[in-house]
Amino acid sequence: MVTFINLILGKKLGWSTVKIAASDLTDNALETTPKRLFYEIVLYSFAIEFVGAVILSFVFVPDFGALGIFEAIFLSVSAFCNAGFDLLTATPGAVGLSEYTNNPLVMITLIVLITTGGLGFIVWRNIRHYNKTKRLLLHTKLVLIMAAVMLFVGAAIIFIVEFSNQDTLGQMPVGEKILTSIFLSASSRTAGFPCFDMNDLMPFTKIIITILMFIGAAPASTAGGIKITTVALVVCTVISVLKGREDTYLMGHRIKRDAIYKTFTVIVLSLTLIAVSFTGILMCCEGMSLQKTIFEVVSAFSTTGFSVGASAEMNVPAKLIMVFTMLAGRIGPVTLMTSLIIRKNHNSDKNRILPEGNILVG
């Protein structure tokens, strides 16, 4: 957002700004001028949101008249940005998204918007220029595979667990159950559109949604969480260790150790932030449900917005902790900590040669 405002004001952007804004990306992704890169992001975003709004208008205009145009635009932007705001609950004559779970056009459009926003602009740009380059970046391949796996595995678990739950999927036809399960799986990775009361979900489903919220979507996207690439690298690293390899390999590539270090740093700092916030809220509010509290904290960290009602029961100090958790989760724990701790001159260690040390682990 700061970068976009600077462009509007005509200020120049240096590569240092771009590197900071796109620190999660590969160097190959930045083979363009800074200004063009950010103009492409804005253009892609508006184009996708416009198409989504037009499609949703075919449903909302007949239902709400001229107000339906605004509803379609707002919901399209909200879905693409993974914001999760839904004005349908405040619209006369509407109940909310739960009223449209039987409408494939609305559900599929929102799923596509949420998923597209969660892929990240580097993936859009790589796909758009595929005809010229004739190759996909390793980052793009990994994001597309992980996004599909997370979406459909999450949907399958939700479908199976909630199949007979009369408060959620139980009374729906099979086709609607499948589509709603996919929608809830997509929404759980930081979009936060509820299609029914989250308290009505089975306990195991809440655990799965908590995991999906914690993971989130892709780096450099509109979503939060620790990111799907982080999870993929952890899995690959564990497999490499079990196979006795010194390096981590993924799709025929050897992953840089810096990326592995950052991966585990992200997870440790994220879990630490969640644990500290969770403990702080329990200390501030006696009698809070453990399951509800951890659900709310992870939802805040990933900026998903799902709630089981625990936030309304919190006092002011606990709510301030939630605000800090949302802010830290949105900025990113690594970015936040490095900006506070790391000094500008960090090259001194590169010239130091120290003896190796062996420590027993596990």
Model region roles, listed by residue range:
Residues M1-G362:
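Membrane-proximal intracellular helices of multi-pass ion channels
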